[in-house]
Amino acid sequence: MAELNVEIVSEERSIWSGAASAVSARTVNGEIGILPGHTPMLAVLGDGEVVVRTTDGGTVTAQAHGGFFSVDHDRVVIAATSARLGDAAAA
């Protein structure tokens, strides 16, 4: 089964990395969803929740603010100005 190699980083540190089956995030142009095999792209990250569906069936959420979202050959890098694990309801 194809998978994504995902990395979420902020200016200060690495937030999370691992294998995923899907990733969704907010860009300045709206929500985007990424599955394995997605075409390469680069987007400006908006403020909001990043949701990673891990290959073991779990979910990782992070709050991200500003930065970039890139996809290339099943590698997803979310380079946020600031980010932290957890959803908005936990804040």
Swiss-Prot record:
Bilayer topology annotation: Peripheral membrane protein
Compartment annotation: Cell membrane
CDD domains recorded: F1-ATPase_delta
Keyword set includes Membrane: yes
InterPro entries tied to this protein: ATP_synth_F1_dsu/esu (IPR001469), ATP_synth_F1_dsu/esu_N (IPR020546), ATPsynth_dsu/esu_N (IPR036771)
Subunit structure: F-type ATPases have 2 components, CF(1) - the catalytic core - and CF(0) - the membrane proton channel. CF(1) has five subunits: alpha(3), beta(3), gamma(1), delta(1), epsilon(1). CF(0) has three main subunits: a, b and c.
UniProt protein name: ATP synthase epsilon chain
Organism: Micrococcus luteus (strain ATCC 4698 / DSM 20030 / JCM 1464 / CCM 169 / CCUG 5858 / IAM 1056 / NBRC 3333 / NCIMB 9278 / NCTC 2665 / VKM Ac-2230) (Micrococcus lysodeikticus)
Gene that specifies this protein: atpC
